[in-house]
Amino acid sequence: MSAAEIELAHIVRTLRASSGIAHKGDIAQVVRALATPGDGAARGGAWAAPVGDDCAAIPCDGGGYLLLAIEGFVNEFVAREPWFAGYCGVMVNVSDIYAMGGRPLAVVDALWSRDGDAALPLLQGMAAAAETYRVPIVGGHSNRRSDREQLSVAITGRANRLLTSFDALPGQNLVVAFDFRGAYHEPYDYWNASVGAPPERLRADLELLPAIAEDGLCAAAKDISMAGVAGTALMLLECSGIGATIDLAALPRPDGVPLARWLATFPSYGFILSVDDAHVDAVAARFRSRELACAVIGRTDAGRKLQLTLGGQARATLWDFNQQALIGCAPAKETDHA
């Protein structure tokens, strides 16, 4: 095997064993448990976006969509980083809304703590993020007699035109966008490009997503989650019933950050979009105009596999949806992309 083949094989093994992708795989059991035969719940029923997307999307009588999302946080993270956990509770929900082509309206939270003092840094973190992103915290639930701190945060928003995980098509470009104006929140693989950044800049950077949707430049996107770039791409491809090839050599990353770590990173501002040839230059130009890193890293196809390459020197299959589901949210019937 060549050096590139050895490196790529190691990357594939590492990604398949990663906790980020494993956590996403847990979604499949939940989808099966909540689906009722005959009612279409597993595919979204009457809702605009099927189960498995970054937000639920409910059509509004007057047009547009009501968006709903929720995040829960690992207890160890909440215990070690209470202020940052509170901040992330708002930040990641805001990102989910924008990833769907929407704009946030309000946040609610569920916070359990040992007492009022233990809850304070979590509340302060949420308040700081709410001010940064101009999203009010309008209510929630609290329990100050718990044996530990636990946090979950939910959000609602509105979208005029959706970006979804279910509308990528074969023959499109996989485009990623990142904000490199940050640093790792050590020791975690969290690239923090939000705390301390100018709030006006953060909000304007996020506004690119609904503008791209409303201008008809793209219909499919996801925010890059704890599953990293490859894991997020897997979810997008599975939901759309397609495959892709991604060239890891084309993946932009901050100076000095090893590829292996960047592939495992939650980037705070990071999105993957599936874009037609006719619009790819316009989409990239919008991100770059705001000093955001943006690049085409791959091409979608009808093969229902995600294959990785390293500058064309090696090729390996990360996931074959013909053999194994990940989150279990593929189209109910095999998609005809002929």
Regions found by a protein language model. Give the residues of each.
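Small-aliphatic-rich amphipathic alpha-helix that forms the alpha element of a beta-alpha
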Residues: 81-108, 121-132, 207-213, 229-235
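Glycine-rich anion-binding loops of enzyme active sites
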Residues: 65-66, 73-75, 103-187, 299-301, ...
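Beta-strand->loop->alpha-helix junctions that form or flank phosphate-binding loops
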Residues: 47-50, 143, 243-254, 284-311
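Acidic, Ser/Thr/Pro-rich beta/coil linker or hinge segments at domain junctions
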Residues: 2-14, 22, 26, 290-338
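Active-site-proximal betaalpha loop/short-helix elements
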Residues: 114, 201-268
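Helix N-cap motif at beta-to-alpha junctions
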Residues: 274-281
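General beta-strand structural signal in soluble alpha/beta enzymes
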Residues: 47-51, 59, 67-69, 136-140, ...
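N-terminal glycine-rich phosphate/pyrophosphate-binding loops that anchor nucleotide-derived ligands
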Residues: 1-90, 94-99, 135, 172-173
